[in-house]
């Protein structure tokens, strides 16, 4: 049987074909030029032809992929989670803990600017209740130092968690008062036709949230 003439992928190469030419122009020129003889009934020749064709197609794919732009994938940095800390919708962080001295009731310790501050407040409460057996976010040494810095003390018969809550509440009030006094000194306030509402503070709002959560939990 006479061998069939099968178009070879490389039969179209000529001096006119340049490196910058596209695969389309290469295939179009190859259809009008020389052909290599392959016997369609010869398995070895057809296998060789298949390898040549596959190699050519892979070359086209690799060449095209080099021209594709590389997309940078930005990974969102996940926030570190701390024990006893919740993020509030307005961006601040609340610390809370279950008071083992009062039948495990959940106590809101306060709202803080950062998750680390809230986590430290939780650690202070946990350490004051359970001592070295407490599971903490930070090291016990750091927690002990922070308790010394805020001059933490509590009376016998009083919950150490409640004492810490009062301590944080007093510190927030003092900080807010200093901030308001500073703002008032640096600006003049015009009160013509202005209705002034009483600022109940974050603590009141947090207590409302805490009471609603407790009513749904217990």
From Swiss-Prot:
InterPro entries: AP2/ERF_dom, AP2/ERF_dom_sf, DNA-bd_dom_sf, ERF_plant. Residues 18-35 have a biased composition (Low complexity). One of its GO terms (molecular function) is transcription cis-regulatory region binding. Residues 81-139 bind DNA. It comes from the Eukaryota. Residues 1-38 are annotated as: Disordered. Keywords: Activator, DNA-binding, Ethylene signaling pathway, Nucleus, Plant defense, Transcription, Transcription regulation. GO terms for cellular component: nucleus. Signal peptide: none annotated. Its main location: nucleus. It is found in: Nucleus. A motif (Nuclear localization signal) lies at residues 165-181. Ubiquitously expressed, mostly in flowers and rosettes after ethylene treatment. GO terms for biological process: defense response; ethylene-activated signaling pathway; jasmonic acid mediated signaling pathway. Induction: Induced by Pseudomonas syringae tomato (both virulent and avirulent avrRpt2 strains), independently of PAD4. Ethylene induction is completely dependent on functional ETHYLENE-INSENSITIVE2 (EIN2), ETHYLENE-INSENSITIVE3 (EIN3), which is itself a transcription factor and CORONATIVE-INSENSITIVE1 (COI1) proteins. Induction by jasmonate, B.cinerea or F.oxysporum as well as the synergistic induction by ethylene and jasmonate requires EIN2 and COI1. Induction by methyl jasmonate (MeJA) is independent of JAR1. Induction by salicylic acid (SA) is dependent on NPR1 but not on PAD4. The AP2/ERF domain binds specifically to the 5'-GCCGCC-3' motif. The affinity of this binding is higher if the seventh amino-acid of this domain is basic. Acts as a transcriptional activator. Binds to the GCC-box pathogenesis-related promoter element. Involved in the regulation of gene expression during the plant development, and/or mediated by stress factors and by components of stress signal transduction pathways. Seems to be a key integrator of ethylene and jasmonate signals in the regulation of ethylene/jasmonate-dependent defenses. Interacts with MED25 and TAF12B. PANTHER family: DNA-BINDING DOMAIN (PTHR31190), ETHYLENE-RESPONSIVE TRANSCRIPTION FACTOR 1B (PTHR31190:SF132). Belongs to the AP2/ERF transcription factor family. ERF subfamily. This is Ethylene-responsive transcription factor 1B. It comes from Arabidopsis thaliana.
């Amino acid at each position: 049987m006479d061998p069939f003439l099968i178009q070879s992928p490389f039969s179209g190469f000529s001096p006119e074909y340049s490196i910058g030419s596209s695969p389309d122009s290469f295939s179009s020129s190859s259809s009008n030029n020389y052909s290599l003889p392959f016997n369609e009934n010869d398995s070895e020749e057809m296998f060789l032809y298949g390898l040549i064709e596959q190699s050519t197609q892979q070359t086209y794919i690799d060449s095209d992929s080099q021209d594709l732009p590389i997309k940078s994938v930005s990974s969102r940095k996940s926030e570190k989670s701390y024990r006893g800390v919740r993020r509030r919708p307005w961006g601040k962080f609340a610390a809370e803990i279950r008071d083992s001295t009062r039948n495990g009731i959940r106590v809101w310790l306060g709202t803080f600017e950062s998750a680390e501050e809230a986590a430290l407040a939780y650690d202070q409460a946990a350490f004051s209740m359970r001592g070295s057996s407490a599971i903490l976010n930070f090291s016990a040494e750091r927690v002990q130092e922070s308790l010394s810095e805020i001059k933490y003390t509590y009376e016998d018969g009083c919950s150490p968690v409640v004492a810490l809550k009062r301590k944080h509440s007093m510190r927030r009030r003092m900080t807010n008062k200093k901030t308001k006094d500073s703002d008032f000194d640096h600006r003049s306030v015009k009160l013509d036709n202005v209705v002034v509402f009483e600022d109940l503070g974050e603590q009141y709002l947090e207590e409302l949230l805490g009471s609603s959560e407790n009513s749904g939990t217990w």
